[in-house]
Amino acid sequence: MNNSLSLFVKEMRKRFGFTQVDLAAKAGVGLRFVRELEQGKQTLRIDKVNQVLALFGYEVGAVPAGKEHSV
């Protein structure tokens, strides 16, 4: 996963005053998943990522990658 996503989730979790345990419980995912998400694991289930992001009013979506990635 993109490191900026990991940092975003960690920052939002702290802003909301959640521990990793709190976030896992509120999002309905495992603690291990939250840890892996915040550590930038490269392969994560998008549905679970969206469960976490939904707590903060966000979801994973397609965005422009930048000029170097254009067809």
Q: Can you name each region flagged by the protein language model?
A:
Residues L7-D22, K26, Q51:
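Short basic helix-loop element that most often maps to the first helix and adjoining turn
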Residues D47-V63:
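DNA major-groove recognition helix of helix-turn-helix/homeodomain DNA-binding modules
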Residues M1-S4:
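A detector for short, charged/polar N-terminal pre-domain segments
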Residues G28-Q42:
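Recognition helix of helix-turn-helix/homeodomain-like DNA-binding domains
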Residues K67-V71:
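Helix-turn-helix/homeodomain-like alpha-helical modules used for DNA recognition
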